[in-house]
């Protein structure tokens, strides 16, 4: 199967070669989202948007599109890619002497059969207290551009970094071990037919492996790809990993935040 990296990042290109020596690249064109209270959800949403846009560019090809989106979170503040040197300076000053999170959302998508699976990885990075001179010396190299949080970990030395907890590759931009696990899970996704819906939560109801399965964002008549996330003795819970055949009663949501706030949960009934 063809493997396509939906990114122009040289860092992600280098890291993906640890899994696939040969692959193609497609550059997605999206507007990244930073609205919302959950940074993990934001990173996943941006990764999914990249994968889907790349899928539109390659058509219905039977391939595995891999995309990622990395954000830095300091306290409750999400730090994206700085637009200019002044913003990068503010970011580094904010990170100085603190522990922050580096979150990478990952998405795997096959436009041929509409399988889509996403997850995230998180690494905790602690910075030493930085002097103004250290920050200015780093900024003078002009390497802060296109880097979440204003820095690339492979371009700074021990005078910046105090401790890393978690995947180093994740901080670079693509957590290789996490991606390997996701590829295995992607290849094990199952199909299910939805025949009912629960109230008041609105989960779709189907059967898989002889047990009732409750699936998010599904309506009667849908045929879906699913991943089981919780098993009970007589039933299980699963996430929707792509619609194979749409139900005749399914409609496209008017609100782009459908399913996130719950206000329009019953729209598809």
State where each predicted segment sits.
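N-terminal beta1-alpha1 ligand-phosphate binding loop
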Residues: 1-21
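Anionic-ligand binding patches
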Residues: 2-4, 39-186
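Generic preference for hydrophobic
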Residues: 3-5, 25, 125, 194, ...
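Short loop/helix-cap segments at secondary-structure boundaries that form the rim of catalytic
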Residues: 15-18, 35, 57
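A short beta-strand-loop structural module common to alpha/beta enzyme folds
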Residues: 23-34
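Residue-level signal for short segments within beta-strands and strand-turn junctions
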Residues: 27, 74, 108-110, 208, ...
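A short acidic, helix-capping loop that chelates divalent metal ions and anchors anionic groups
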Residues: 32-37, 74-76, 265
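Non-catalytic accessory regions of SAM-dependent methyltransferases
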Residues: 184-269
